């Protein structure tokens, strides 16, 4: 699973998702991509589930790029613990995905396979997405 090797700080603020993505809105590597419509927090597990679904559909052909990286530590308190007594310990990593951000890109497979792979990947993600082509 994706996680940063080093961190400057152990815990992060909850934060908010930015209004619209400023960078990473155009296809850079592949011919087909998965673009977010909503802004939401995507966890490392969800990214990995999407990657597995897409590569399984592509039958290990072509190439898949993941354009997002989970770098925000999300903390959580244990179940049935009273309020207060500090912030919980870091539980998992997530990335804040803004609307318009390209999340996955595919190259080197037929169009119908690429579209199916991106559909399967989008089903694993908590954001609404749309599939974009290079020349659209």
Swiss-Prot record:
UniProt GO MF annotations: rRNA binding; structural constituent of ribosome; tRNA binding
Organism superkingdom: Bacteria
Pfam families assigned to the protein according to its UniProt record, in alphabetical order: Ribosomal_L16
Entry-linked CDD domains: Ribosomal_L16_L10e
Keywords from the named record: Ribonucleoprotein, Ribosomal protein, RNA-binding, rRNA-binding, tRNA-binding
GO BP, sorted A to Z: translation
Subunit structure: Part of the 50S ribosomal subunit.
Biological role stated in the UniProt entry: Binds 23S rRNA and is also seen to make contacts with the A and possibly P site tRNAs.
Family: Belongs to the universal ribosomal protein uL16 family.
Protein name listed in UniProt: Large ribosomal subunit protein uL16
Source organism per UniProt: Rickettsia akari (strain Hartford)
Classification of source organism: Bacteria, Pseudomonadati, Pseudomonadota, Alphaproteobacteria, Rickettsiales
Gene that specifies this protein: rplP
């Amino acid at each position: 699973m994706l996680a940063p090797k080093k961190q400057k700080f152990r815990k992060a603020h909850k934060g908010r998702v930015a209004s619209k993505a400023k960078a990473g809105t155009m296809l850079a590597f592949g011919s087909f991509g998965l673009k977010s419509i909503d802004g939401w927090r995507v966890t490392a597990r969800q990214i990995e589930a999407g990657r597995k679904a897409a590569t399984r559909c592509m039958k290990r052909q072509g190439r898949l790029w993941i354009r997002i990286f989970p770098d925000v530590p999300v903390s959580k308190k244990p179940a049935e613990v009273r309020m207060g007594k500090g912030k919980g310990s870091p539980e998992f990593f997530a990335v804040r995905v803004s609307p318009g951000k390209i999340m996955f890109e595919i190259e080197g497979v037929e169009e119908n396979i690429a579209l199916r792979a991106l559909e399967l990947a989008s089903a694993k993600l908590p954001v609404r997405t749309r599939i974009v082509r290079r020349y659209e």
